[in-house]
Amino acid sequence: MKIFLDTANLESIKKFNDMGLLDGITTNPSLMSKEKGNPKDAMEEITKIIKGDVSLEVVSTDFSGMVDEGKRLRQYGDNVVVKVPMTPDGLKACKSLSSEGIPVNVTLVFSPNQALLAAKSGAKYVSPFIGRLDDIGQDGMNLIQDIKDIFKNYPHLKTEILVASVRHPMHVVEAAKIGADVVTLPPGVLDKMLQHPLTKIGLENFLKDWEKVKAENPDIKI
């Protein structure tokens, strides 16, 4: 399963990319608004840092506006994936852009029907928002399983399932068990995935024991 980082924060992107963890980036207008500076500079820098796909979202809501904006966003790099909303105009823009070789990520997906229609329109990625479904008392992971089952029936659909609105590490585990193609994570969730109390305790014990060895063998070097 590929791991994308859901952020526009350059420091976080560089941090996790240096660990070799990132296969791509997803952004949206809300994430861009949290960062200082010119969003154009940030988008250009992100596409240079990350070799994998970088989803940049349109802010237009009509068909022609989304297509025009999508083409401009694509100019930031060959790894740019244009992100459009799951609306009638969004699907129309998806079909238009994908037919010109511009990959599209259809976002704000909350049902299997929407995912199927996005795939039919030519989307490279479909982004189901699981956390927001959990927030209203539904099980977001059931949606991922339903989409996975549907896509499995139709191998000609090459659309990848990009699990979004991830709230905690267990969402990642569940997505991986189902077989989702991609999960996009806030930096805080990826930080939590790196940590376990027993890892910390084990490392501390190893170092304490090694200090004893060094005390008994002051000339030892490794």
UniProtKB/Swiss-Prot annotation:
Keywords, in A-Z order: Cytoplasm, Pentose shunt, Schiff base, Transferase
Gene Ontology MF terms in the entry: aldehyde-lyase activity; transaldolase activity
Entry's Gene Ontology BP terms: carbohydrate metabolic process; pentose-phosphate shunt
Family assignment from sequence similarity: Belongs to the transaldolase family. Type 3B subfamily.
The keyword Cytoplasm is annotated on this UniProt entry: yes
Record's keyword annotation contains Cytoplasm: yes
Cellular component per GO, a single term: cytoplasm
Subcellular localization(s) per the UniProt record: Cytoplasm
Role, per record: Transaldolase is important for the balance of metabolites in the pentose-phosphate pathway.
Record-given protein name: Probable transaldolase
EC number(s) recorded for this UniProt protein: 2.2.1.2
Active-site residues (renumbered): K83 (schiff-base intermediate with substrate)
Alphabetized NCBIfam families for the sequence: fsa_talC_mipB
Enzyme category, top tier: transferase
Organism: Nitrosopumilus maritimus (strain SCM1)
Pathway named in the protein's UniProt entry: Carbohydrate degradation; pentose phosphate pathway; D-glyceraldehyde 3-phosphate and beta-D-fructose 6-phosphate from D-ribose 5-phosphate and D-xylulose 5-phosphate (non-oxidative stage): step 2/3
Gene3D superfamilies: Aldolase class I (3.20.20.70)
Swiss-Prot/TrEMBL catalytic activity: D-sedoheptulose 7-phosphate + D-glyceraldehyde 3-phosphate = D-erythrose 4-phosphate + beta-D-fructose 6-phosphate
